[in-house]
Amino acid sequence: MRRFFYRHSRGVTEVVVGSGLQYGDYVERPVVLAEEGLRPPIPGAPTLALRGGEEVKSLEVLTKVYGFLKEVGADRSTTLVAVGGGALLDLATFAAGTYMRGIRLVHIPTTLLAMVDAALGGKGAVDWGPVKNLIGVFYQPAAILCDLSWLGTLPERVYRSAFAEVVKYGLALDGDFYSWVRENAKALLARDGGALEYAVYRSLQLKAGVVEVDEFEERGVRQVLNVGHTVGHAVERVLGLLHGEAVAVGMVAELRLSSELGYLRESHVAEAAEVLSSLGLPTSVKATEQQLAEAAALVKFDKKRRGGHIYIPLVVRPGRWILEKIAVEEVEKAVRYVLRQGG
C-alpha cells in the first residue's frame, strides 16, 4: 500500500493506493452513492444506487441525490462516499460541495481511468441540456481511496484505455516516470499488482503537484493536464472512441505538432507512439472524409480558443512542456495527422 497527502484551499487530502482497503478506517457517518451493480463498499451504510455514465450528471439525478441526503438525515458531520467511475465522482463532488454548503467527501474510484484522472482534482459538475459540465464547483475530497481490487473485472479495452492518461503524466511532467512506463508496459497490461500500484500512485502524485499550484485554474499551470485533449476531444466526439483511446490519438497529433514547430525531436514522437501502441492504444484512426471534416471543425469550439488561436500545452521533451498559442488552422491540420481516410 502507498499513500501521500496534498494541500489545497480546504486543507489536506489523503490519497491511498492498494488492494483490499478497509474503507471504514477513513470515514465517519458514511452515506454512499454507488454505481448500480457494485458490491456495497460499507455494509450497513445508507446507499443510493445510480446508473453510471454521463447520464448521471443531470439536474434530475442531482435533485434525487439531495432528496436522499435529506431523507437519511445527512448533515455537516456526514461523509458522502462516492463509489464508481468518473461521471459518478463528478456528480458526487458537486453534490457534496453544495449540500448544506459543503459536507465531507471521500472518493472510491472503481475504474482505472477514474483512479488516475477524475478522482483527484476537485472538479465537480453536472450537465445542462446538451452542454457538458456547464454548472460546476471546485471541491476537494477529504480522501481518495484507490482500491485496485475493483479492477479485476474491468473489461480489457476499458482497462487499457486508461494508460493514455498515465503516459501523459510521464511525457509532460516526469521523464523518469515516462521511461518507467515504457519499460513496464508488459507488466501493466498483465495487471501486475506491484506495477499497477506504482503507476496509479505516481500518476496521482504528479497530478496533485499540479493541483496544489493551480487549484482553481487561474495560473495556467493546470493546462498541462490537457496534453492530448485538444485533438483528443474532437476525435472522441466524432468517432465515438473511449476517452483514453482518443487522448492517445490526440497526444500523437499534438506531439507531431510540437515537432513541426521545432520544439520536440521527431524521434520522441515515434517513441511515444511506440509506447502507446505497446499498451494497446491506437495512435491513428480510420475516418471518412466527412468525419475528418467534422473533427477538424470541432477544434474551433475548444474552450481554450482565443480569437483565431488555441492555447495548447505542448511537450518539448519528456518531462517538460510549454503553453503555446497555435493558429486554429494548424490544429485542424494536426487532426488530419492521425485520422486516416477510409471506411
Curated annotation (Swiss-Prot):
<feature type="binding site">
    <location>
        <begin position="110"/>
        <end position="111"/>
    </location>
    <ligand>
        <name>NAD(+)</name>
    </ligand>
</feature>
<feature type="binding site">
    <location>
        <position position="229"/>
    </location>
    <ligand>
        <name>Zn(2+)</name>
    </ligand>
</feature>
<feature type="binding site">
    <location>
        <position position="243"/>
    </location>
    <ligand>
        <name>Zn(2+)</name>
    </ligand>
</feature>
<dbReference type="InterPro" id="IPR056179">
    <property type="entry name" value="DHQS_C"/>
</dbReference>
<comment type="function">
    <text>Catalyzes the conversion of 3-deoxy-D-arabino-heptulosonate 7-phosphate (DAHP) to dehydroquinate (DHQ).</text>
</comment>
<dbReference type="GO" id="GO:0009073">
    <property type="term" value="P:aromatic amino acid family biosynthetic process"/>
</dbReference>
<keyword id="KW-0057">Aromatic amino acid biosynthesis</keyword>
<keyword id="KW-0963">Cytoplasm</keyword>
<comment type="pathway">
    <text>Metabolic intermediate biosynthesis; chorismate biosynthesis; chorismate from D-erythrose 4-phosphate and phosphoenolpyruvate: step 2/7.</text>
</comment>
<keyword id="KW-0170">Cobalt</keyword>
<dbReference type="InterPro" id="IPR030963">
    <property type="entry name" value="DHQ_synth_fam"/>
</dbReference>
<dbReference type="GO" id="GO:0005737">
    <property type="term" value="C:cytoplasm"/>
</dbReference>
<protein>
    <recommendedName>
        <fullName>3-dehydroquinate synthase</fullName>
        <ecNumber>4.2.3.4</ecNumber>
    </recommendedName>
</protein>
<keyword id="KW-0456">Lyase</keyword>
<keyword id="KW-0028">Amino-acid biosynthesis</keyword>
<keyword id="KW-0862">Zinc</keyword>
<feature type="binding site">
    <location>
        <position position="132"/>
    </location>
    <ligand>
        <name>NAD(+)</name>
    </ligand>
</feature>
<dbReference type="GO" id="GO:0003856">
    <property type="term" value="F:3-dehydroquinate synthase activity"/>
</dbReference>
<keyword id="KW-0479">Metal-binding</keyword>
<feature type="binding site">
    <location>
        <position position="165"/>
    </location>
    <ligand>
        <name>Zn(2+)</name>
    </ligand>
</feature>
<dbReference type="InterPro" id="IPR050071">
    <property type="entry name" value="Dehydroquinate_synthase"/>
</dbReference>
<comment type="similarity">
    <text>Belongs to the sugar phosphate cyclases superfamily. Dehydroquinate synthase family.</text>
</comment>
<feature type="binding site">
    <location>
        <position position="123"/>
    </location>
    <ligand>
        <name>NAD(+)</name>
    </ligand>
</feature>
<dbReference type="Pfam" id="PF01761">
    <property type="entry name" value="DHQ_synthase"/>
</dbReference>
<feature type="binding site">
    <location>
        <begin position="86"/>
        <end position="90"/>
    </location>
    <ligand>
        <name>NAD(+)</name>
    </ligand>
</feature>
<dbReference type="GO" id="GO:0008652">
    <property type="term" value="P:amino acid biosynthetic process"/>
</dbReference>
<dbReference type="Pfam" id="PF24621">
    <property type="entry name" value="DHQS_C"/>
</dbReference>
<keyword id="KW-0520">NAD</keyword>
<keyword id="KW-0547">Nucleotide-binding</keyword>
<dbReference type="InterPro" id="IPR016037">
    <property type="entry name" value="DHQ_synth_AroB"/>
</dbReference>
<dbReference type="InterPro" id="IPR030960">
    <property type="entry name" value="DHQS/DOIS_N"/>
</dbReference>
<dbReference type="GO" id="GO:0000166">
    <property type="term" value="F:nucleotide binding"/>
</dbReference>
<dbReference type="GO" id="GO:0009423">
    <property type="term" value="P:chorismate biosynthetic process"/>
</dbReference>
<dbReference type="GO" id="GO:0046872">
    <property type="term" value="F:metal ion binding"/>
</dbReference>
